[in-house]
C-alpha cells in the first residue's frame, strides 16, 4: 500500500472515558513507538496526568491493550517519553519531567529509566539517569541498550553515551 493504514485502537473507549469523567482516558498529544524482535508494537502516549501504554500484535494490526490502555503510574507532566524494545517483550522506558521522581534509586537526574521483561505488564523500580537531554535505543535482536545524552554537568557541549550489554537489567547503564 502507498499509505499508512489505520489500525484498531482505543478512540471509542477514550470518548466514553471523557464523557463519563474518566479523565483523559489515554489519548495524549505526543509519545514514542518501538517494536520488539517478535514484531510486537509498543506505543507510549503522554498526557499532563500520566503516560499510557498501547500494545499491538501481528505487526501492529491487532490492538492488545486493555479496553482503554495501561496507565504507567509514573509521574505527571512527563515531557517527551522515550521507549525502546527488544527480544521477546523487553521494554525500556526513559521518562523526563525535569526532576527525579522520589521513588528513583541511584543518582538524581532529569531523566529516569524503567525496565520491563513482560511486555509492559510490570516495570522495575526506576533508576535516575544523571545528565541532560536524553534519548534511548536498543538492538531488536541483541542485548545492547544505549542512552545518548548531553553532558549537563559541564559546559563542554559533549554527548555521553551510556551502554548496557545485558538488556538494561539492574541499573545496567554505565
Language model features by range: what are they?
Residues 1-174:
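C-terminal PAP-associated
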Amino acid at each position: 500500500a502507498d499509505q499508512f493504514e489505520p489500525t484498531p485502537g482505543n478512540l471509542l473507549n477514550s470518548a466514553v472515558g471523557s464523557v463519563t469523567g474518566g479523565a483523559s482516558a489515554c489519548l495524549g498529544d505526543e509519545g514514542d513507538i518501538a517494536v520488539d524482535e517478535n514484531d510486537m508494537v509498543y506505543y507510549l502516549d503522554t498526557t499532563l496526568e500520566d503516560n499510557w501504554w498501547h500494545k499491538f500484535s501481528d505487526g501492529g494490526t491487532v490492538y492488545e491493550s486493555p479496553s482503554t490502555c495501561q496507565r504507567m503510574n509514573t509521574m505527571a507532566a512527563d515531557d517527551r517519553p522515550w521507549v525502546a524494545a527488544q527480544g521477546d517483550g523487553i521494554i525500556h522506558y526513559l521518562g523526563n519531567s525535569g526532576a527525579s521522581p522520589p521513588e528513583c534509586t541511584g543518582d538524581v537526574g532529569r531523566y529516569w529509566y524503567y525496565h520491563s521483561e513482560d511486555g509492559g505488564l510490570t516495570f522495575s523500580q526506576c533508576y535516575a539517569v544523571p545528565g541532560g537531554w536524553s534519548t534511548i535505543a536498543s538492538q531488536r535482536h541483541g542485548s545492547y541498550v544505549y542512552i545518548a545524552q548531553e553532558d549537563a554537568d559541564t559546559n563542554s557541549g559533549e554527548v555521553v553515551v551510556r551502554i548496557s550489554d545485558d538488556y538494561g537489567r539492574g541499573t545496567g547503564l554505565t
